[in-house]
Regions:
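Structured, non-membrane catalytic/scaffold regions adjacent to prosthetic-group chemistry
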Residues: 1-60
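C-terminus-biased signal that marks the final domain/tail of proteins
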Residues: 22-24, 31-32, 41, 64-198
Length: 198
C-alpha cells in the first residue's frame, strides 16, 4: 500500500486484486483473521478484513478501533448494544476482543480531542494500554493472546509511534525526516536498544 497516494487509491488497488491470507490453523481449527486499518493525511479511513480467506473492505471516518475477532459487522452490533446501555455505569472488562473493542470505542469517544501532539500521544497511549492483554497472560483460549506491541500514528505531523511490550520505552519515526525516495538507502531501527536518563 506504500504505492498509493491516499486511502481511496489503496482501496481501489485492493478491490482490483484477489488478495488472500494463507496461514496455519490454530487451536481447535481456528484460522488467521486480520483487521488492517488504513488512514491518509486527510483523515479518510478504511478497514480491510480478511475473514475465512475473503477480503471485506469498510470505509468511513468512524472506523477508529480494530480488534481481530469477531468479524467487523458483528463487532459493531456488540458495540451498539453497549453504546445504548451507556458506558458511564458499566463497561465490559474481560480480555476478549469484543470487550476490548467496546472499551476502546467508549474511551475514544469520551477523551479530549486536542491539536497538541504530546497530549494526543499520551491520550492515545493510555487508551491502547487499557485495551491491551497483559504480557504473558494465558488462559487457554485460542482467540486471546497477550499484546506484543501497540502502534499508532499522528497523520498531521507524519509520526509513527510504537512500543514493544518487552521494551520499557516507546519509539517513534518522524517520516518527515526520512528519505523515502526511490533508491534511497534502507533504514532500520534497532528496537532492542533502550535509553536511560538519570
Amino acid at each position: 500500500l506504500d504505492m498509493c497516494a491516499d486511502t481511496p487509491e489503496a482501496v481501489a488497488l485492493l478491490r482490483q486484486h484477489n488478495f488472500t491470507i494463507s496461514g496455519a490453523t490454530f487451536d481447535h481449527g481456528t484460522t488467521t483473521a486480520l483487521h488492517w486499518g488504513i488512514t491518509d493525511s486527510r483523515g479518510r479511513s478504511a478497514m480491510v478484513e480478511f475473514d475465512h480467506g475473503k477480503i471485506n473492505i469498510y470505509e468511513g471516518q468512524d472506523i477508529k478501533v480494530l480488534t481481530n475477532d469477531p468479524p467487523y459487522l458483528q463487532m459493531n452490533a456488540i458495540n451498539d448494544y453497549w453504546v445504548k446501555k451507556g458506558g458511564q455505569n458499566t463497561l465490559p472488562g474481560t480480555v476478549s476482543s469484543p470487550d476490548r473493542y467496546v472499551r476502546g470505542y467508549f474511551f475514544d469517544a469520551h477523551v479530549e480531542k486536542t491539536g497538541e501532539a504530546d497530549l494526543g500521544v499520551s491520550i492515545t497511549r493510555s487508551i491502547l494500554n487499557n485495551v491491551s492483554v497483559p504480557y504473558t497472560y494465558t488462559l487457554g483460549d485460542a482467540n486471546v493472546s497477550s499484546t506484543q506491541w501497540r502502534s499508532f500514528s499522528n497523520i498531521r505531523d507524519l509520526r509513527y509511534y510504537f512500543d514493544i511490550v518487552t521494551n520499557p520505552g516507546m519509539f517513534y519515526v518522524d517520516l518527515g525526516k526520512c528519505d523515502l525516495r526511490k533508491g534511497a538507502s534502507v533504514m532500520k531501527l534497532d528496537t532492542t536498544k533502550t535509553a536511560d536518563y538519570v
